[in-house]
Amino acid sequence: MPVTKKSQILVVRGQVIFPFVPFSLDVGRPRSRKIIKALKTLKTKRLVLVTQKFTGEQNPEFNDIYHVGTLCEIDEIVDVPGVDSKTVDYRIKGRGLQRVLIEKFSDADINEVSYQLLNSTVKDEANVDRFLQRIFPEKEEIEQLMEGAEKFLELENISKTVNVPKGLKQLDIITFKLANLVPNTESIKQAILEENEIANRLEKIIQAGIEDLQKIQDYGRSKNKETEFDKLDSKITRKINEQLSRQQRDFYLREKLRIIREEIGISSKKEDEVASIRKKLDENPYPEAIKKRILSELEHYENSSSSSQESTLTKTYIDTLLNLPWWQKSKDNSDVKNLIKTLDKNHTGLDKVKERIVEYLAVQLRTQKNKGPIMCLVGPPGVGKSSLAKSIAEALDKKFVKISLGGVHDESEIRGHRKTYLGSMPGRILKGMTRAKVINPLFLLDEIDKMTSSNQGYPSGALLEVLDPELNNKFSDNYVEEDYDLSKVMFIATANYIEDIPEALLDRMEIIELTSYTEQEKIEIAKNHLIKRCLEDADLNSEELKFTDEAISYIIKFYTREAGVRQLERLIQQVVRKYIVAMQKDGIKQETIDVNAVKKYLKKEIFDHTMRDEVSLPGIVNGMAYTPTGGDLLPIEVTHVAGKGELILTGNLKQTMRESANVALGYVKANAERFNINPSLFKKIDINIHVPGGGIPKDGPSAGAALVTAIISSLTGKKVDPTVAMTGEITLRGKVLVIGGVKEKTISAYRGGVTTIFMPEKNERYLDEVPKEIVDKLNIIFVKEYSDIYNKLFS
C-alpha cells in the first residue's frame, strides 16, 4: 500500500522539473522566499517542486497546480539582490530525485503537502526496445546508454536516495534525460512527467520531437510558393552579390540582415554595438583564442532578444574580455638610483628595509623577469608596508593596484564565479587587471595573512596559481574561462603576522620584516609628511600652524602606543581641528603648538611609559619586553615569606613565562651555595614572583635572566642598580640564549632611563638595527652564561 509523506512544496512557473536532471531556479515570490529561507537552516534540503498551470497567479491554490511533481534535493542556495533594496531573492540549484503524486495541501501550512512516491512500470519490454531503437537506431548506442545510466546511479548514489524498482532505474534516467531535451511546451513536458509506463513515456517523447520537426518541414514546404517576400529576398540576394564577390558566409548573412532592416526601416542599437566590437577586434591585436571566443559570444548576443537576461549576461561577458589588457604594456623605469631616491623621499627611516627592497628589485630590473620569490612585507600596523609598495610603483613607473585580502574566505573571490551563477563576475585578480589596463602593473596583495578557509574553498590555494611564476602565465579564472598571462605582473604582499601566512604561500615569498619606528623616526615622519598632509587637508599653511619637536615628542610618548604612526596622524588631525575651531571662535591668526598647547587641545595624557625606579630595593630587577606596539621595561618583583617551599606566580603570566620562572628557580636552587644561599632555606619559605600590570597578559622566555637575578637579589638581600636592565632566556645549566625584538627592547630601555643592558652574546649581530645614537649612550654587555651577569652585579 502506498505510503503518504509530507514535505514543503515550491511552485514554479514555466518549467517542468524531471527526476535525475539538474536544475537552476530563481526564487522571488514572497511565499517562495519564505520556504527557501527556512530550508537554508536545515541539514537535509529536500522539497517537492511542482509546475503552476497558469503563470499569472501569484498565490496558487491546489487547483492552480499540476498534481504530479518531483521530489528534489537542493544542493546550493545563493542570495541574490531582490527587485528592491529591502528584499533578498534566492537562486537554488539541485537535482530531481523521484516523481510524486500530490494529494493535498496541509491544513496547518499552505506551503506543506501530502504526497506519495510514483514508480515507473513496464508492461511490454518489446515496445520499450522498439521506441528506443527509433531514437537510437544502433544497438550499441542503447547498450552504452544503459551502461552510462548505471554509472550515473553509482556516482550520484541514486539507489540509496530513490525508491525505484531495480530494473527500471536505468530506463527512468534515460527517459527523463531525453524528456528534458524536448524543445516543447510545459504542458507536453508535464504529460511526459505524469506518464508511469516507460513505453508510453518514450512514445510521447518521440511524438513531441516529431511535432517540432513537422513544424520545420511545413514551414519549408510553404516557401515553395512564390510570394512578395521571396521576390524581396531575391532582390536582396542579387544586391549583395553585386557588392560582395568572395566574402565569407557569415559576412554575407550579416549584410543580408542589414539590408533587410534597411528595406523595412528598422535600426538597432545592438547592431551599432556589434559593429563597434567587430571593428575593435579587427583594429587591435587580441590573441586569436580571445578573438574566436568573443566572436562566438557575439553571435549569441546578436541572436538573443535585447530584453532577455541572456543578452545582458552575454554582453557583460564580452565587455569583460574586451576590457582586459591582453597586450597593452607600460614602459618601466629601470633606474635603480631613481628607486633609491623615491624610497628615501617618501619614507623616513627603514634603512635596512629599503636596502633589501633595492637589492631584490635590482636583480628583477636587470633580468626583466619576475621569476624570483614574491616580496612580502611583514610588520605591525601603520609602519608603512602599503605606502612602501606604492612608492615602488611610483619609482618604477608602474600602474598600482591594491587588493585587500582581509576576511576573504571564498575561493571565487580570487578565481571568479562561474557564468552560470546570477551576478557572476571575474575574481579580484582579473578585476584588478582591468583597472590597471596594462599587463605589467604592480599588484599589492594586502593583509595576505587575514585570509580564511571555509566550505566555499581555500582562497590561499587559488593564490598559489597567481603567485607561482611557473603557473601564472596560464591563470584560469572561472568567469573568463580563458587562460590569462600574469607573468608580467609584479606582486608584493603585506602581512602583520608571519605565522598566519599559509605555509605553501610562505614558501614562495621573500620575507622583509618591518619593525616599529623609533621616537626620533616618528618625529621626522611627522615633520616631513604627517603635519604637511593634515594642514593641506584643512586648507592651512605652515605659517598659520606650527608644531615644535617637543610637542610632537610629547604626543608620541603620552598619547600613543603604537609601532607605526597612524594614531599619531589622527592626533595631529585632532589638534588641527581644534585650532580651526579656536581660529573661527576667538579670531586666532596663527599658533605654535608646544607641550602646553598639546595639553590644552588633547587634554590629559593617555599613556605612561614604564620608567626605572629611582631607589633600588632587594628583589626588584628590570626585564625588557617586546610588544606589538614596540617595547617596554618589564619590572620584576620577587619576595619570600615563611612557608613550605611553594612558588607563587602573579601578574597574568602565560604558560611560557611560568615555565621560565620555574626554570629560573630550579637553576638558583641547583647553584644555591655558589650564590651564597643556604640550600635548606628553600624548604622553609614560599617565593612570590610578581610582574606589575596584571591587566596585561605576559608571555615568552626572554625574562629568564631577569627572573634569576630577582630571585638571588631577594634571597641574599643584595640590591640591583635600577639603571640596569637585562634580557635573555635561561636554561637549567645557566646558559643565556638568544631572544627577539632587540631593537624595540633596547629603545624602550633607553627611554625608561636605563644605562646598562645585559644581552645574550648571540644577539650582538642584531645591534646594527638599533639607532647608533642610542647604542652610543648605553653600556651593552653581552653574556654567554648567567655567571657573567652574576659576577658583574653581585661579586
Curated annotation (Swiss-Prot):
Active site (catalytic residues): 702, 745
Compartments reported by the entry: Cytoplasm
Pfam families assigned: AAA, Lon_C, Lon_lid, LON_substr_bdg
E.C. number: 3.4.21.53
Stretches assigned to the Lon N-terminal domain: 7-213
Superkingdom in the source lineage: Bacteria
Chain ranges of the Lon proteolytic domain: 615-795
InterPro entries, alphabetized: AAA+_ATPase, ATPase_AAA_core, Lon_bac, Lon_bac/euk-typ, Lon_lid, Lon_proteolytic, Lon_Prtase, Lon_prtase_N
Binding positions (ATP): 379-386
UniProt keyword annotations, A-Z: ATP-binding, Cytoplasm, Hydrolase, Nucleotide-binding, Protease, Serine protease, Stress response
Induction: By heat shock.
Annotated GO biological process: cellular response to heat; protein quality control for misfolded or incompletely synthesized proteins
Keyword Phosphoprotein: no
Gene Ontology terms, MF aspect: ATP binding; ATP hydrolysis activity; ATP-dependent peptidase activity; sequence-specific DNA binding; serine-type endopeptidase activity
UniProt subunit comment: Homohexamer. Organized in a ring with a central cavity.
PANTHER family recorded: ATP DEPENDENT LON PROTEASE FAMILY MEMBER
Family recorded in the similarity comment: Belongs to the peptidase S16 family.
NCBIfam families, per database record: lon
Stated role: ATP-dependent serine protease that mediates the selective degradation of mutant and abnormal proteins as well as certain short-lived regulatory proteins. Required for cellular homeostasis and for survival from DNA damage and developmental changes induced by stress. Degrades polypeptides processively to yield small peptide fragments that are 5 to 10 amino acids long. Binds to DNA in a double-stranded, site-specific manner.
Protein name as catalogued: Lon protease
Organismal lineage: Bacteria, Bacillati, Mycoplasmatota, Mycoplasmoidales, Mycoplasmoidaceae
GN (gene name): lon
